[in-house]
Amino acid sequence: MKTNDNYIEEVTAKVLTSGKYSTLYPPTVRRVTERLFDRYPPKQLEKEVRKKLHQAYGAYIGGIDGKRLEKKIEKIIHEIPNPTTDEATRTEWEKEICLKILNLHTSTNERTVAYDELYQKIFEVTGVPTSITDAGCALNPFSFPFFTEAGMLGQYIGFDLDKGMIEAIEHSLRTLNAPEGIVVKQGDILSDPSGESDLLLMFKLYTLLDRQEEASGLKILQEWKYKNAVISFPIKTISGRDVGMEENYTVKFENDLVGSDLRIMQKLKLGNEMYFIVSRL
């Protein structure tokens, strides 16, 4: 007779063998399967897991081809000659290259107008961190020329769900000779053990977490160990329309923090995104 764990493992394995879901982080698929297990009979469970994954991770599933992404990045790198002159010239080359790479993903594309001052403004409030954790990083590891220029020369760890994207980022960072302290890996902030760093980045992630599990964004902020965290929200739609997102997200986030041990140190608005710099009381 199959146990509950047997059913969960079986459904998780079936979902992960599907081409559409095969590059998704396995603990994420198992977590979703476990959450839905008591709600649906075994014969319906696999269908509901797929449905939930599509709802929660539609931006990743089917939207990322790691090999294609890697080729696009390689093309960008080879189109702009690598300078062999002074360090300042190389830094400007890295910034030009990385901005083009950051344009390849919707979330970082919207942020390219802000990178020149984003980390400097954050570090003015938090101090220069010795370590950064970037949860749900997407292509944000390629902002390294901007946070290193702002003084962050320690360890940066970025993680995201899609294996193909992470492998493409790893390979491309090596091609660019990025600092050794920059590490990317496959991971899920809701599935993995809590971590520790000076600065936790949750760019456009808080709302996505809450959509998966109620109040999980706040739960992560309370469980992780950090000196400061930066949580961002979009203030306009992808098409640039103002539909009240800034007010709605601000009210929601401020209300979430009521009664917690967290406080907002500063709110920044850069481009179509707002950033809340948070610390513990």
Curated annotation (Swiss-Prot):
It comes from the Bacteria. This is 16S rRNA (guanine(1405)-N(7))-methyltransferase. Specifically methylates the N(7) position of guanine 1405 in 16S rRNA. Confers resistance to various aminoglycosides, including gentamicin and kanamycin. NCBIfam families: 16S_rRNA_Rmt_C (NF000150), 16S_rRNA_Rmt_gen (NF000466). Belongs to the methyltransferase superfamily. Aminoglycoside resistance family. It is an enzyme of class 2 (transferase). It catalyses: guanosine(1405) in 16S rRNA + S-adenosyl-L-methionine = N(7)-methylguanosine(1405) in 16S rRNA + S-adenosyl-L-homocysteine. One of its GO terms (molecular function) is rRNA methyltransferase activity. The lineage of its organism: Bacteria, Pseudomonadati, Pseudomonadota, Gammaproteobacteria, Enterobacterales. S-adenosyl-L-methionine binds at Y60, H105, T106, S107, R111, G136, D160, Q186, G187, F203, Q212. Keywords: Antibiotic resistance, Methyltransferase, Plasmid, rRNA processing, S-adenosyl-L-methionine, Transferase. It holds the Pfam family FmrO. The keyword Chloroplast does not apply. One of its GO terms (biological process) is response to antibiotic. Its EC number is 2.1.1.179.
